[in-house]
Amino acid sequence: MSGKNDFYSTLGLTPIINAVGNQTIYGGSTPSGDVKAAMEAAEDNYIVMEELFQKTGEYIAKLLGAESGYVTSGAAAAITLSVAGCMAGTDPEKIATLPRTDGMKNEILLQKPQRYTYDRCFELSGAKLVEVGSSDHCSKEELEAAINDNTVAIAYYVQPDNWESKAVSIEDALEIAHNNNIPLIAAAASQIYPIDYMLENAQRADLVCFGAKYFGAPHSSGIVVGKKEYVDKVKAQSFIAYQLEGRNAMGRSMKLDRQEVIGAVVALEQWVKMNHEDRFSVNIRKQESISDQINNIPGVSSEVTETPTFNKYALKVNIDPNVMSAKQLADELANGNPRIMVAPPADPNAHVKSDITAAGHGIETGNNFLLINTSEVSESQVSQISNRIKEILSK
């Protein structure tokens, strides 16, 4: 095994080829050479962390056109600290009390159509998530009527279609929040492309939470941007705030290295300034290379297709069900040599989802295909994927 993988081997582990994308369960992200170099340079010197967070917060706010910003240990931490900030503010006694919320407003409203896998993060600092509306619809009247004396904020799960007729739009939700003197916390983890769309997301809510792994930052980093009044409250909950002014903040467990902070900022700057058409071209070329190699397999056809994600394109591999199920192919790829992951597991024993989701990969109900994402696939791994598919389907 090659040198950089030697310790995986020592531990008895087999590295994977990640043809899924920026998934936490597979390691998250592949920082660019410039990001890695900036992180290595940061490692050479110690820094006053409070000063680092202040300056990097100002920098990311400028990049995204927001009033203020803060680097966190992922989007989940950004949400958790945002809620904590809305409840406890900068009051040292309240900060030290969380996640107990006695005497604090602690209800977060979330429209029921927007319930999603990670909305648990809105409760981790002690808040109570209150559903509004039905599973398929929530109206402005219902959202407004749900606000009471214990409501501390409205949560909003950002999606490109702005929820159309299913839920209250973010613009209307923000108006309702402000009319009632409460903030809106937007979960926009992977809503980072097109860039104008990312900037729009960053600039409209009171607190907006992004996962930095999606734009090539270290896996365990994220950012929160928004109104300075609220970002200052987020800072007061952070891991360094635990040692400042006797706050004993709950964010102590959400620690970041100085290198990760720098990596997140450099990656963000690259993301907002890069030519994304070049990024797409690189991935399309990889996908077309795989397609050219597998399209001559009986019962297989493939094509580059658009997906509703920041990566925009993936390779759709159609398989004749009489030859093999897409799930079986995904399982054999995941458990062979090399190990190739082509879809996130819906459960620990599955390697595909039941639909093409916002993650951009899976098996469509009633059809038999899988999607290959090449954003985290190296040039040398492209042929390994096509060769392995040919090997499996030629048995």
Task: Name each model feature, range by range.
Residues G3-T30, G57-V71, A76-W271, N295, ...:
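Conserved PLP-enzyme active-site core in the AAT-like
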Residues F7, N295, G299-I385:
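Conserved C-terminal alpha-helix-loop-beta "cap" of PLP-dependent enzymes
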Residues I17-K55:
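A glycine-/small-polar-enriched, mobile loop at the entrance of the PLP active site in fold-type I
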Residues E40, E269, S386-S394:
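A short, amphipathic alpha-helical segment
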Residues Y46, D161-W163, S378-E379:
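Short strand->helix junction
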Residues F239-Q243, A334-M341, K390-K395:
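A common structural junction motif
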Residues L256-D257, N283-N295, N318:
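Gly/Ser/Thr/Ala-enriched C-terminal appendages of enzymes
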Residues L268-I290:
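Structural signature of PLP-dependent enzymes
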